[in-house]
Amino acid sequence: MKNICTFVARNKMKKNLKNIFARTWGLMMSTTATWEDIAEENSKENDSFLRFVLPWIAFSTFIILIFDALYAEVKFVETGFVHAFINVIALLGAYYFTLAITSSILKKNMSGIYSVIKAEKMVAYSFTVIYVLKVVAAVIPSLFFLQILDVYTVYIVWEGCRVIFNIDEDERGKIMLFISLSIIFTPMFIKRVILLMLPAF
């Protein structure tokens, strides 16, 4: 019985990892089609967070812990753990802050189409580029200039607003602006604030 449970758990984890990779790749390479798949997916509240956001935060944090420790000139272990901790706080804070902004805007201006689950999907998957670039920059710091690709988040959000909420172009522009700016800049802001409180790092 124990072996069966372990097998089922492994299969479920493997399936979830494949789904995360497929969604990540799809949103960057075939944005519209992937959003349509996400929109059709039956989800419960917090599913997008648990199945996509949390695994990505855990993975990026692990990579940052390892590589920041390896690249540190002094205080190897401390540097790795501090930067990993900052990553967790920055990404979690950015997710919940952006979700709050998205929910507030939609409730105020489009209460008829607002749904908690749809808002979670919209925000969770729109962080895709941010997560990928976090990992790339941690592994190869010299590629820091790739952060400019954060702007692709704007297109992901634009298509997400259309597919998930069926918002027309006029309204979509305003919502897209707030969501995109929050996704791109909130992690940076939180990281900067924490670093100011930790001058040794």
Give the location of each predicted region.
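Hydrophobic alpha-helical transmembrane segments and adjacent short intramembrane/lumenal linkers
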Residues: 103-188
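Helix-loop junctions at the membrane-solvent interface of multi-pass transporters
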Residues: 66, 70, 139-140, 193, ...
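Selected alpha-helical membrane-embedding segments in polytopic membrane proteins
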Residues: 12-114
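Acidic, Ala/Val/Gly-enriched low-complexity intrinsically disordered segments
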Residues: 8-9
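Juxtamembrane boundary at the C-terminal end of a transmembrane helix
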Residues: 186-201
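Hydrophobic core of alpha-helical transmembrane segments in multi-pass integral membrane proteins
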Residues: 60-61, 65, 183-189
